[in-house]
Amino acid sequence: MLIWAHGLWGSPNGSKVTAVRESGIEVLSPDFNDMELNERIDILNELVSKQEVVLAGSSYGGLACAFVAQQQPEQIKGMLLLAPALHLPESPNENPEKLVAPDNFPISIIHSVTDEIVPISASKDYVERSENNLKLIEVEDSHVLENSFSLIISE
């Protein structure tokens, strides 16, 4: 099961998750609109605790996924982060430099080098801190990654 966490301006039926669904991948995408980070993490933790999953998160949703993966690594089979907002010092991520990736499952990050919303340095710092086998794919696109749908689906 793929659990999709959309970003602040996204929705459970946004363009990226719709493209993934249309490719034939089964996706569960909760509605996180108007929710703080803690609320998103609570919902994801509950879903993840029920079965092994693959997590995918975009921007703010990527931050929530990274946090849940750190809390429940044994339940995660893989994770895809899209322009993740890993640098935001927001509760419970008051110290972003302490957020590290688990090393027991594959993780891919797709981030645009020209992202004007979340700097690519957020992803690069996460990769460097984590000291494990993360795959950072740098693309030329916007924060929304609208030109990278085929890459998102393949990852």
Predicted regions and their residues:
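Active-site catalytic motif of lipid deacylating hydrolases and related acyltransferases
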Residues: 1-51
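Acidic catalytic loop of the alpha/beta-hydrolase fold
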Residues: 11, 87-88, 114-118, 143-144
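Short alpha-helix in the alpha/beta-hydrolase fold that links the catalytic acid
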Residues: 16-17, 94, 119-128
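Conserved alpha/beta-hydrolase fold motif
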Residues: 54-56, 79
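Gly/Ala-rich beta-loop-alpha elbow adjacent to hydrolase catalytic centers
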Residues: 56-66
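Post-His helix in hydrolase/transferase enzymes
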Residues: 142, 146-155
